[in-house]
Each structure stands twice: as structure tokens, then as C-alpha cells.
């Protein structure tokens, strides 16, 4: 009889996971304690939105284990640690500690990582099918790498759609603004003949009689969106290239193995087999 894994994890399952991946458990424990400390601090200061984000992070921390237990997928320790660090860096450091504002390239670093990880995910999905003897499905290394790249870029585009929707519907500022000193637009053409007109050397902008004080024109999200997609592109290209050589020279790509999930080998239930019919 086939047993389906349960969630939350049973004590035996959790102990086995700790023994199998001690580094992952250590990182998980340290980050979880830090998030709990932030949660308590947020509640004391009556910052309930921050407290909600902390609770969300604690749930997301369980996601890798949930996937492994319920879908029969084995995540490499390196990949799992990066996922945990990514969640912490994006939500706790980025949002609550304002790293997105303090460090200008924090967002770009996270989007580059996203491109890399999503390419690894797309690569794994196709590669698992490619190696499954029960499925008549065999693709060349270049096609698998290209599909992984496209998967990563699609996720990146969908995320930008989400950011745009949040900004439009809920007046958020997920697509960060950029101060520029030059703009070009056909709307500035007095002849209305679709001729782009450029204004250079912008040092001040007045809105409804109020000086903004940014030292330039405030671009609304375009530069941020394109930069996010570009660094996502870089991350996707890097992993797709690594994945290509991993398939081409099967078994020699140690770097790729550290990021590619695999199907867990199911062990037969000997107790069920020994039962009399």
C-alpha cells in the first residue's frame, strides 16, 4: 500500500531531514529565530503590517519541506539554503529593514537570483521528463536550455505584471521610481507629427505649484521594470548555459547538480508486500 506523506511533517520525517541536511536545518533555525524576534518587536510597536509579513515569511520557510514531502521532489541543500536566504533578504531585509531604499542594487541582486533559480526550476521540470523512461520524450540539450531560459523570463514578466497591478489598484510603489535629467516624448512635439522632442538638463520639476526637490524629473517605474527584466535575463542566461553543459556532459556538472531538484526514489513498502492476500 502506497503511503502519502503528511504535512505538517511528522517527528520522524523531521529528524530524518535534519540528519540528511544539517546545513539546511542550521540556516533554517537561525533565520526562523531572527524572524520570530522581528515579529515580537513588530507586535510590541503595534506595527501589525510588519507582523503579518513576518508570519508570511515563517509560512514560506516551510515551503521547501512541504514540496519535498508532498510531491516526491528532492531539493539540493545549496538550492534550499539559497531559497531560505532569498525569502529573508526580500521580505525581512528588503521590505521591513528598507534595504531596497538603503542599498540601490538590492532589488537588482534579488531579481538576478530569481532569474537564476527560475531557470533552474524550468530546467529541472523538463530534464525530469527527459530522463523518464516511461515517457516518450527526449529533447536536445540546447532545447532544454532554451526552454529553461523562456520559463525564467516568463516568470519575470508575470512578476512585473503583478507589480504594475499592485501599483495601479492599491497605490503601492513596487515599480520604484528613477530621477532622470532628460526626457524624450512625441507628446512634446507642437506640430503633432509624431516627432520625438528631447528636454535635457532637467534640474527641477514643479507639480501643482510645488517643487519636488529631486533635482530632476521623476520617471514612474519604467527604468526599474526594464532593469529588473535585464538582470532576470542575465540570471536566466547564466543558469541555462550551465544546464546546457550539464546535460551535454551528464554527470560532470557539479555546479548544476547543486541547483537542480530531482525526483525522490520511492522505496517499496515491504510490509505491504509481505501481507497475505
Predicted regions and their residues:
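Membrane-interface helix caps and helix-loop-helix hairpins in membrane proteins
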Residues: 43-48, 70-73, 96-106
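Short, highly charged, low-complexity non-transmembrane loops/tails of multi-pass membrane proteins
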Residues: 253-274
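Short, Lys/Arg-rich, polar N-terminal cytosolic tail immediately upstream
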Residues: 1-21
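Cytoplasmic-side transmembrane-helix entry/capping segments in multi-pass membrane proteins
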Residues: 55, 74-85, 108-111
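Interfacial helix-loop-helix junctions of multi-pass membrane proteins
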Residues: 96-107, 156-239
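Alpha-helical transmembrane segments of multi-pass membrane proteins
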Residues: 61-65, 86-91, 148, 152-159, ...
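Membrane-interfacial alpha-helical segments at the cytosolic side of multi-pass membrane proteins
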Residues: 113-130, 168-174, 234-248
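Membrane-interface helix-boundary motifs at transmembrane edges
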Residues: 67-78, 134-139
Amino acid at each position: 500500500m502506497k503511503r502519502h506523506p503528511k504535512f505538517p511533517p511528522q517527528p520522524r520525517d523531521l529528524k530524518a531531514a535534519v540528519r540528511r541536511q544539517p546545513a539546511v536545518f542550521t540556516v533554517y533555525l537561525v533565520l526562523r529565530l531572527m524572524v520570530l524576534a522581528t515579529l515580537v518587536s513588530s507586535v510590541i510597536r503595534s506595527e501589525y503590517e510588519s507582523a503579518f509579513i513576518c508570519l508570511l515569511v515563517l509560512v514560506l520557510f516551510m515551503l521547501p519541506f512541504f514540496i519535498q514531502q508532498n510531491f516526491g521532489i528532492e531539493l539540493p541543500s545549496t538550492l534550499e539554503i539559497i531559497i531560505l536566504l532569498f525569502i529573508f533578504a526580500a521580505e525581512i531585509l528588503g521590505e521591513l529593514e528598507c534595504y531596497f531604499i538603503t542599498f540601490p542594487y538590492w532589488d537588482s541582486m534579488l531579481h538576478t537570483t530569481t532569474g537564476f533559480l527560475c531557470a533552474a526550476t524550468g530546467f529541472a521540470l523538463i530534464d525530469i521528463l527527459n530522463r523518464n523512461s516511461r515517457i516518450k520524450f527526449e529533447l536536445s540539450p540546447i532545447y532544454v536550455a532554451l526552454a529553461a531560459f523562456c520559463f525564467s523570463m516568463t516568470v519575470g514578466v508575470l512578476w512585473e505584471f503583478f507589480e504594475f497591478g499592485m501599483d495601479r489598484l492599491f497605490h503601492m510603489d513596487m515599480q520604484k521610481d528613477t530621477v532622470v535629467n532628460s526626457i524624450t516624448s512625441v507628446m512634446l512635439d507642437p506640430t503633432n507629427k509624431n516627432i520625438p522632442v528631447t528636454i535635457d538638463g532637467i534640474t527641477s520639476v514643479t507639480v501643482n505649484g510645488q517643487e519636488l526637490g529631486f533635482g530632476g524629473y521623476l520617471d514612474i517605474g519604467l527604468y526599474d521594470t526594464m532593469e529588473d527584466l535585464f538582470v532576470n535575463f542575465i540570471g536566466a542566461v547564466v543558469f541555462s548555459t550551465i544546464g546546457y553543459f550539464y546535460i551535454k556532459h551528464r554527470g560532470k556538472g557539479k555546479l548544476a547538480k547543486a541547483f537542480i531538484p530531482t525526483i525522490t526514489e520511492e522505496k517499496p513498502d515491504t510490509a505491504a508486500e509481505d501481507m497475505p492476500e
